[in-house]
UniProtKB/Swiss-Prot annotation:
Organism: Christiangramia forsetii (strain DSM 17595 / CGMCC 1.15422 / KT0803)
Intracellular or extracellular location(s): Cell membrane
One cellular component term from this protein's GO annotations in UniProt: plasma membrane
Underlying gene: rny
Membrane topology note: Single-pass membrane protein
Protein name: Ribonuclease Y
Amino acid sequence: MEILIIVIAAVVGLALGFAIAKMLEKKQASGTIASAKKEAGSILKEAKAEGESIKKDKILQAKEKFIELKSEHEKVILSRDKKINDAEKRIKDKESHVSNELGKNKKLNKDLEEKVADYDHRLDFLEKKQEDIDKLHNSKVQQLEVISGLSAEDAKAQLIESLKDTAKADAMSIIQDTVEEAKLTAQQEARKIIINTIQRIGTEEAIENCVSVFNLESDDVKGRIIGREGRNIRALEAATGVEIIVDDTPEAIILSCFDSVRREVARLSLHKLVTDGRIHPARIEEVVKKTRKQIEEEIIDIGKRTVIDLGIHGLQPELIKMVGRMKYRSSYGQNLLQHSREVAKLCGVMAAELGLNPKLAKRAGLLHDIGKVPETETEVPHAILGMQWAEKHGEKPEVCNAIGAHHDEIEMNSLLSPIVQVCDAISGARPGARRQVLDSYIQRLKDLEEIAFGFGGVKKAYAIQAGRELRVIVESEKVSDEKASNLSFEISQKIQTDMTYPGQVKITVIRETRAVNVAK
């Protein structure tokens, strides 16, 4: 029973609490609604005020935009009206100009028609005059034919033939005079150019280049160079390919070899060995190997210095090396580099005298004998071989042709070719240039003259042109014209039989007859 009362009391308490809570909630909600209504009224009032303000601003902006668009539209209309007015004005001006031009053209056409009519009248008059002249001409021609007894065609043919013969005679006379003058002038100019060229070049005589002499401080060094049982000298000869001659010559050893490079390698190697003091086969091989490398470097330096001295640029490295190697080559005993430098200078001077390119001429002169550089023999002539190398290394066609044609192996098609040929002959043919020291050169000239004096009737004999020509003056009483021809042949045969000489010897026999009388 007590439990039931407690449960009922609890239920009643809960119901009462719930009712009180509901009453409190309703009271609170009514207060909130009133507040919200008040706040909503305030917001609505503010929104209306702001909307009126925005509406006024938009209306004002729309008015301003309308005014702006109206102003721009008026400007466009004004501009368009101006363009239309300008176009109308230009059209009116053109119409006026066209009208003026039409008026002028009408006037010109009228003047032209009048001139054409006048010219037609004149042409008719001239044609009539021409007919009268033709009739008169034919009449005169007929009268002349009757008087001369020749027709007009025959007279014309005779006149043409006479004029032709006269013109031929005059032309032949002019041609002969021109040819003679050209020959004389050409010879004089050629002599002048060659003489000027030679005078401006200083040259040296050739040197003997088959042996070199290595000087020693004392004869005691000779034994060390020879070595025990000659092993050092044999090792040196085997390493260099040079014959080493040790004789009784005091303080000197002779190095003999046709190859200048080998001889120079041997000389420098000996100098290093003697200076160092260590002379034995192993050391000899080491020094010779280093010396060969040094010589190769010197060859390149010599080539570079040579082309710089001559003012030649753009030469390929392989050609520069060939130029340097020329120092250790010889041609008929003449040092090849000295000869090529000399020819290059001669070519430069001669080309300048003739108004040609001196630099190109120097280039051709320097390279003209590069075909003689290789150590091994070849079946190709050195001029052709040099031309092939020059072509291979990009030299100009004029230079290549000058190299290949300087001994007439190919046809000359460049003005440089005869210049190189002439300068090569000048350098090689002068006294003492090639292997013949002055004494042997003079002796050969004397022998030529002695052979001429060995024949009867010879009055005088002169060896000239560096021994390339022998002029023989004979006594006219003893030698007739027929015998003079036979004498030159006999002298040439005698020279061929008894003498050794380079090139050719020209024999010229001169017979002179003089008749002298005295008027008293």
